């Protein structure tokens, strides 16, 4: 595909002028109406730091989720008075002054359930309702019931929810899909964006922007009425992601927006805070201390921004795959994020047209077309033959292949010849016996080899099918489903991530133990079951032998760990 003509930057500068002024107004309006609850590290100050550093709980998220029994200022004053007294017991002080999160009741599924029956039975188990919360609770109230991922995750998560909703729709629970869309719209109206999760300590960042795709999913059931109903919230979310663009000069970045030297507008992940994450406090402090050559605030921001990406953590963000303290998320322009922004612009155009505003629809189409050219120019590695992230420091596309490279295919932003090359690269470098590898690098981080994640399996499967690459798409689905089934047969559960180097093993690495449940795995499994089995003969388990005979592709043996360039 040709690069954009040299005259385009000036033209593009004119295009967004009026539309971005509108967005700036929307963003200010959202800020004015938002009531921002303070996260526990601010509410509790030195007490929070001391409790986390004392490692009273195996999981740092436990105290971040604890609810103060009275005004935090009073608790803090009591702490300052008592902490230096002889015999002071910090654990006792915490137990007296806080209500700790309860352990969820262990769900024991009925015996003899098929995989599909198990998933259908889990939806009510994973459903929560928090219309009201305690005054100083870090949990943010939501007007409708919602489905949580499972395990340590006691709240709703933004991008997880889209893949969970795919499964809810597949199970016929359109009411739950509608409820979750309404909840996210409520968050946009209340806070100006959708936070990472419904916790006060997640408010400083978002996650991969799937809200427009959620509305599009709901429109499959409700028609254009859903698009028209949620157009204002989709516009507000777009304003959040593009906040600051109207003041950007070429070569500058502001929050989540990047303006390259030729005027191309792209996006990056960003967190508004540059402190340790409350839910991983001690770990973040240790990471920052391990690299004294970088300001701690810079490392904290990049750790938080990696959490905003959903890929926390991955060699994708790091200069040295074996050293987390070399991550620099904010200087990388991600291919998956910009694909999702392209899709958001396309859905906004469709929704504007449905609402009768053809002029606005044309503006969004123009923005989407400009972004598509930017993706093709800056996020394609011609030498390697795959999509990749762009490095703002080296001013070059990066060399590393990751599963994020399938996102341009998923949103129909890829050129056909490049989609064909992506199919080859996927089959050669990422396809494994148990599904699609996240990267080909073994770093010990959870978003690296040998782990495979349900959302990335589905993005790849859908993306490849969009471009007629059914053979590789079906290979991914079959390998991943076999892995899920083998694990379920042995453990009687679905898990957050899987080791794809073989089948039947949950994934490892990362900051916490493997979690079961698990929302997005449930959703993707249902979608894939219906993909591999003919409609006239739906399957409740993964068949022992492959139903479709179009493909006999074997995955190429993966190379050992490759360094990130």
Curated annotation (Swiss-Prot):
It comes from the Bacteria. It is an enzyme of class 3 (hydrolase). One of its GO terms (molecular function) is alpha,alpha-trehalase activity. GO terms for biological process: cellular hyperosmotic response; trehalose catabolic process. The active site is at 312 (proton donor/acceptor), 496 (proton donor/acceptor). It catalyses: alpha,alpha-trehalose + H2O = alpha-D-glucose + beta-D-glucose. Residues 1-30 form the signal peptide. InterPro entries: 6-hairpin_glycosidase_sf, 6hp_glycosidase-like_sf, Glyco_hydro_37, Glyco_hydro_37_CS, Trehalase_periplasmic. It is found in: Periplasm. PROSITE patterns: TREHALASE_1, TREHALASE_2. Residues 539-565 are annotated as: Disordered. Its EC number is 3.2.1.28. One of its GO terms (cellular component) is periplasmic space. Its main location: periplasm. Keywords: Glycosidase, Hydrolase, Periplasm, Signal. Substrate binds at residues 152, 159-160, 196, 205-207, 277-279, 310, 511. Provides the cells with the ability to utilize trehalose at high osmolarity by splitting it into glucose molecules that can subsequently be taken up by the phosphotransferase-mediated uptake system. PANTHER family: TREHALASE (PTHR23403:SF1). Monomer. Belongs to the glycosyl hydrolase 37 family. This is Periplasmic trehalase.
């Amino acid at each position: 595909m040709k690069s954009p003509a040299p005259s385009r930057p000036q033209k593009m500068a004119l295009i967004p002028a009026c539309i971005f002024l509108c967005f700036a107004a929307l963003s200010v309006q959202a800020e004015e109406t938002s009531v921002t609850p303070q996260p526990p590290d601010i509410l509790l100050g030195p007490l929070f730091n001391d409790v986390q550093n004392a490692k009273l709980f195996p999981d740092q998220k436990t105290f971040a989720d604890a609810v103060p029994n009275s005004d935090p200022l009073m608790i803090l004053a009591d702490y300052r008075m008592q902490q230096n007294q002889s015999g002071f017991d910090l654990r006792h002080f915490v137990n007296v002054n806080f209500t700790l999160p309860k352990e969820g009741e262990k769900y024991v599924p009925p015996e003899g359930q098929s995989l599909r029956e198990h998933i259908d039975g889990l939806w009510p188990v994973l459903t929560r309702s928090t219309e009201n919360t305690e005054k100083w609770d870090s949990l943010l109230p939501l007007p409708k019931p919602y489905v949580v991922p499972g395990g340590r995750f006691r709240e709703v998560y933004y991008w997880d929810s889209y893949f969970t909703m795919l499964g809810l729709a597949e199970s016929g629970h359109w009411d739950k899909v509608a409820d979750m869309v309404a909840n996210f719209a409520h968050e946009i109206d209340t806070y100006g964006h959708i936070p990472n999760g419904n916790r006060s300590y997640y408010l400083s960042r978002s996650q991969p922007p799937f809200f427009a795709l959620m509305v599009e999913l709901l429109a499959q059931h409700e028609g254009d009425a859903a698009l028209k109903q949620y157009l204002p919230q989709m516009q507000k979310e777009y304003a959040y992601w593009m906040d600051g663009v109207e003041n950007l000069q070429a070569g500058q970045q502001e929050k989540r927006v990047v303006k390259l030297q030729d005027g191309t507008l792209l996006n990056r992940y960003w967190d508004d805070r540059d402190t340790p994450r409350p839910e991983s406090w001690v770990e973040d402090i240790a990471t920052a201390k391990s690299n004294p050559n970088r300001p701690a605030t810079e490392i904290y921001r990049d750790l938080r921004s990696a959490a905003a990406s959903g890929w926390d953590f991955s060699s994708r963000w790091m200069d040295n795959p074996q050293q987390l303290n070399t991550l620099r998320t904010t200087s990388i322009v991600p291919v998956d994020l910009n694909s999702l922004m392209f899709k958001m612009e396309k859905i906004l155009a469709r929704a504007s047209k449905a609402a009768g505003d053809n002029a606005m629809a044309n503006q969004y189409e123009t923005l989407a077309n400009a972004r598509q050219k930017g993706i093709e120019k800056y996020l394609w590695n011609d030498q390697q033959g795959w999509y990749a992230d762009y490095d703002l420091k080296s001013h070059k596309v990066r060399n590393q292949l990751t599963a994020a490279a399938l996102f341009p295919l998923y949103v129909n932003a890829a050129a056909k010849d490049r989609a064909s090359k992506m199919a080859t690269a996927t089959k050669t470098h990422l396809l494994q016996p148990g599904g699609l590898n996240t990267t080909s690098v073994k770093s010990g981080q959870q978003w690296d080899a040998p782990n495979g994640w349900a959302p990335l399996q589905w993005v790849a499967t859908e993306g490849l099918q969009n471009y007629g690459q059914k053979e590789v798409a079906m290979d991914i689905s079959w390998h991943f489903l076999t892995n899920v089934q083998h694990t379920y047969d042995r453990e009687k559960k679905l898990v957050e991530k899987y080791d794809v180097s073989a089948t039947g093993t949950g994934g490892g690495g990362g900051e916490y133990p493997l979690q079961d449940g698990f929302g997005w795995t449930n959703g993707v499994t249902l979608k894939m079951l219906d993909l591999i089995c003919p409609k006239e003969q739906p399957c409740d388990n993964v068949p022992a032998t492959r139903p479709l005979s179009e493909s006999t592709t074997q995955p190429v043996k993966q190379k050992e760990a490759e360094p990130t360039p």
